UniProtKB/Swiss-Prot annotation:
It comes from the Eukaryota. Keywords: Cell membrane, Disulfide bond, G-protein coupled receptor, Glycoprotein, Membrane, Olfaction, Receptor, Sensory transduction, Transducer, Transmembrane, Transmembrane helix. The gene is OR2T4. Glycans are attached at N31, N37, N218. The lineage of its organism: Eukaryota, Metazoa, Chordata, Craniata, Vertebrata. This is Olfactory receptor 2T4. Disulfide bonds join C129-C221. It comes from Homo sapiens (Human).
Length: 348
């Protein structure tokens, strides 16, 4: 009875019940591998960013400040788009979706990393690692397709302005946005289960600050070459489709802008497109390095730096790009800041 109590308290009731089921299985070795991968007996160890830093406390504070800036910047952008009627257009609807993804994206990795540093813990259980991997891959995939959708929206707005309200009505926007989230979740449901079912080495030290797919795969003690080829092909497809949409959209946009008579119209179109292209280059460039370059180009240190760039810095930069260079957003922000004191004065 004491053994039962100990097992229940140290593995969790779900794992304890699964152990009972495994005793009746015909494949004991497979069960041992599954238990080692999925219970708390052998947690992963995240070596993280702070291990090699000369000033880990300062780095922790900087990342925390950046995290707060990302959350507040994207939250303010979503609030402005929701509250200002002039921003109730398809373009700003997709920008609000991008901000929502960025808030979730940075929240998947940074809070766990900071909490571990403060608590002096660097372990993560296999289920937690799998959940982190799933949400990370899902959000990254969703953002790939959302950036392509935003490029298509700009193409319709600039090249077919008269048909724009019909082609990009509210129902179409909801459908496209839902499709981006769905396709991203397909990536998560595809890569996460396969990656987490590989048998891992005894050390289980992940040379990263979160459970990124390539970093976890490096721990596998079995041949992953076939899966890596499959993952590479999926990434090529996942990147190729949005890149084709973005490239063709902006090619047609440039041709349309070239034929415009109004200098003001050309300037506004260039400003809108350049903001989006900046975000595309930042996000896609980092993704291509991580998932498409050969392993000879990779080192744990380089991978972590690139991951810091597109998991921590990009969510901070995006709202700045779409707000500071956008007169409509800045106008809505000024209106909100001026209305608030006037409202308080009227209440007094």
């Amino acid at each position: 009875m004491d053994n039962i109590t100990w097992m229940a308290s140290h593995t969790g009731w779900s794992d304890f019940i699964l152990m009972g089921l495994f005793r009746q299985s015909k494949h004991p070795m497979a069960n041992i591998t599954w238990m080692a991968n999925h219970t708390g007996w052998s947690d992963f160890i995240l070596l993280g960013l702070f291990r090699q830093s000369k000033h880990p406390a300062l780095l922790c504070v900087v990342i925390f400040v950046v995290f707060l800036m990302a959350l507040s910047g994207n939250a303010v952008l979503i609030l402005l788009i929701h509250c200002d009627a002039h921003l109730h257009t398809p373009m700003y609807f997709f920008i609000s979706q991008l901000s929502l993804m960025d808030m979730a994206y940075i929240s998947v990795t940074v809070p766990k990393m900071l909490l571990d540093q403060v608590m002096g813990v660097n372990k993560i259980s296999a289920p937690e690692c799998g959940m982190q991997m799933f949400f990370y891959v899902t959000l990254a995939g969703s953002e790939f397709f959302l950036l392509a959708t935003m490029a298509y929206d700009r193409y319709v707005a600039i090249c077919h302005p008269l048909r724009y309200p019909v082609l990009m009505n509210h129902r179409v926007c909801l459908f496209l946005s839902s499709g981006c989230w769905f396709l991203g979740s397909v990536d998560g449901f595809t890569f996460t289960p396969i990656t987490m079912t590989f048998p891992f080495r005894g050390s289980r030290e992940i040379h990263h600050f979160f459970c990124e797919v390539p970093a976890v795969l490096n721990l596998s003690c079995s041949d992953t070459s076939l899966y890596e080829i499959f993952m590479y092909l999926c990434c090529v497809l996942m990147l190729l489709i949005p890149v084709v949409i973005i490239s063709s959209s902006y090619l047609l946009i440039l041709l349309t802008i070239h034929g415009m008579n109004s200098a003001e119209g050309r300037k506004k179109a260039f400003a809108t497109c350049s903001s989006h292209l900046t975000v595309v280059i930042l996000f896609y460039g980092a993704a291509i390095y991580t998932y498409m370059l050969p392993s000879s180009y990779h080192t744990p240190e380089k991978d972590m730096m690139v991951s810091v760039f597109y998991t921590i810095l990009t969510p901070v930069v995006n709202p700045l790009i779409y707000s500071l260079r956008n007169k409509d957003v800045m106008g809505a922000l000024k209106k909100m800041l001026t209305v608030e004191p006037a409202f308080q004065k009227a209440m007094e």
